[in-house]
Amino acid sequence: MEIRIEGLRKSYGGKPVLTGLSAVFREGITCIAAPSGTGKTTLLRLLLGLERPDGGRILGADCRWAAVFQEDRLLEDLSAAGNLRFALGSLPGGAGALLAQLGLDLSDPKPVRAWSGGMKRRLALARALLAPSDALALDEPFTGLDGENRARCLELIWRAGAAKPVLLATHDLTGLEDAPVLRLGDR
């Protein structure tokens, strides 16, 4: 699978965010690295079809995406299992094992509002990894995670990248040294 962007442009209020960006994304992790406010989230939103570019072309992005946004977008009154059922329609096989790898318990009946930010972040990642998809868009997926939980998440993200494009927007490239990096410009 290949996703290609050619001459991509996007501005907000007359201020350019992306100016003529071109890249090709294939299976594996590609890190999108840049200071805050320089287009990482914008690029992901364009690829996901949540926004339209001002110019340029996006080819191959009309596939099934799974995403982790900067906000976890969980239903706070539901348990982990309830959140997964709501988002995915049912509990996929392997959900319990995947959550266990992330240090979470699928059978925990507590609503996620009682969980820490890091636990919610890991559940959001699990939801994306369990969703049927051709590509993953991960926007700052390590926010709120300690070193041990970041390592757990990284292992699963690397595995996912063996079969599909994974676009990972981050400020911190620790553990991602072997991934290609698309650096967006400073403002």
Regions found by a protein language model. Name each.
Residues 71, 78-90, 94:
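Q-loop/switch helix immediately C-terminal to the Walker
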Residues 125:
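Hydrophobic anchor residue at the start of the ABC signature
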Residues 3, 17-20:
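Conserved structural motif at the start of ABC-family nucleotide-binding domains
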Residues 48:
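Helix-to-loop junction immediately C-terminal to a conserved catalytic motif
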Residues 98-116:
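Conserved ABC nucleotide-binding domain
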Residues 111, 140-141:
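Walker B catalytic motif
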Residues 139, 146:
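ABC-family nucleotide-binding domains
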